[in-house]
Amino acid sequence: MAVKLREILETIPVYRPGESPDECGLENAVKLSSNESPWEPPASVVAAVQEAALELNRYPDYYKEQLCIDLASCYGLDPAWVSVDNGSGSLLQDVVRIVCDDGDEVLYSTPTFAAYEIDVKLAGAKPVTCPLDDSYRYD
């Protein structure tokens, strides 16, 4: 039995990550476009990950409540106004799904993060772009 995929997927380009410095024949280059750090994680971070790994057999706090409380306290905010996710792409998907209805228009500047158009289309909304000028400002 074949699985029928949503037609909208035909309009969305396949993600192609940028080439690595090795693929380009570059030495001592840093690839910033993939949000990769050129430095190894600090020992304290490695230790925290190792400690957390001891609880991998348990579901985490789904709503990340304690982290939201801690961040809110640090910045003087109400925890209800703090959202934590697996990255900006994941958070963007959540926001678009929560806010947009079919046919809504979502305005954003171009050039921009490639995920904007994809997430807007997947939510059934219509992307509307506003190009930036040569100084990366709105006209």
Segments (PLM) and residue ranges:
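N-terminal "arm"/small-domain region of PLP-dependent enzymes with the aminotransferase-like
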Residues: 1-58
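Conserved core of the PLP fold type I
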Residues: 57-139
